[in-house]
Amino acid sequence: MKIIEWVENKKIKKFKGEISGFDKESIKSVLEFHQSLPNYEKTPLIDLKELAKYCGVKKIWVKDESKRFGLNAFKVLGGSYSIGKCLSEILNEDISKLPFSVLTSKEIKKKLGDLTFITATDGNHGRGVAWMAKHLQQKSVVYMPKGSSQMRLKAIQDEGADASITDFNYDDAVRLANERAKENNWIMVQDTAWKGYEKIPLWIMQGYSTIMSEIIEELEKVKEKPTHVFLQAGVGSFAGAMQALLTKIYGKEEPITIICEPHGANCIYKSFKADDGNPHNVAGDLKTIMAGLACGEPNTISWEILRDYSNFALSCDDSISVKGMRVLSSPLGEDKRIISGESGAVGIGAFVSLYENQNNYKDFWQKLNINNESCILCISTEGDTDKDSYRNVVWNGHYENN
């Protein structure tokens, strides 16, 4: 298998004006809810001018989600909004009337009583759920797949969760959490969907939309827009949410989107490759350093969005993520340094690797049509959520599959 394998999506449809769940009012409601959270700030959209010159393109932007609410990752956006929506249903109130200050009030706690939220996670989503539950004075239970980082486990426990590492891969840890939720009448807050469980995953995806809302607002101020967007995918919830907004906002002028996954958990790539319009799973240990992308079963909601609107999927060796981590950690000239973790850096790693090795990917590079007018957008979805691992990769060149 090559360091990067690519496949073109042959099932793309023409956009007809709406993507269910991502209408203008829904997205506005999400952003307003997040703006009510303590210490809300837009995360930086960093213009890497020197890297753009090096790669022969007009612009390279990287959105740095390590700055999100002090949690070092973007996932709290989905966890917080979905829990807010859960509570709005329980309280029979529109979420617009339940900003954070109201949700965390003694009056609301009295109405709700004691609740427990449960989820499975590689780290970032579980930490976001635990953070929100703690602020609501509610309980959270978090299951992690085997091989998860002790540092990520401790970060979740520090948010007050009953968190533990299981003997299962990610997808089976999700099934375990779902069983426990049913047995104990807990609320399952999972960032992937399956038949019969779609409402909360959609709310989580809507929560992620704040990232792209912030990006588009900032780019509109300087009258710029991306031509190519590299989006990492695990189950596809993040990528699907970003794709939905790109398609909704830009319509016929939407950028080319490239979905990036690890070789060991490339379910979107394999689904594109099958070319039958259906999601296809990847079984086994899902071995990769990209822990946040180590998922083998596509989210059924996001799959339909990616199938209908995303242009390409890449299956990447772990060295591609490592490349991205190092590129962002050791910037050119006056470019700003970005601390990007294993799951955050694969997009920029893929782009730079393709540029530097375009002779090995002539057909793909030609299809991408990247030139000196191209504007590249990547989203670094996490910082150094496992500081020891990050340092070992960036300083020493060590990583598990090396």
Regions found by a protein language model. Name each.
Residues 1-402:
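PLP-dependent amino-acid enzyme catalytic core
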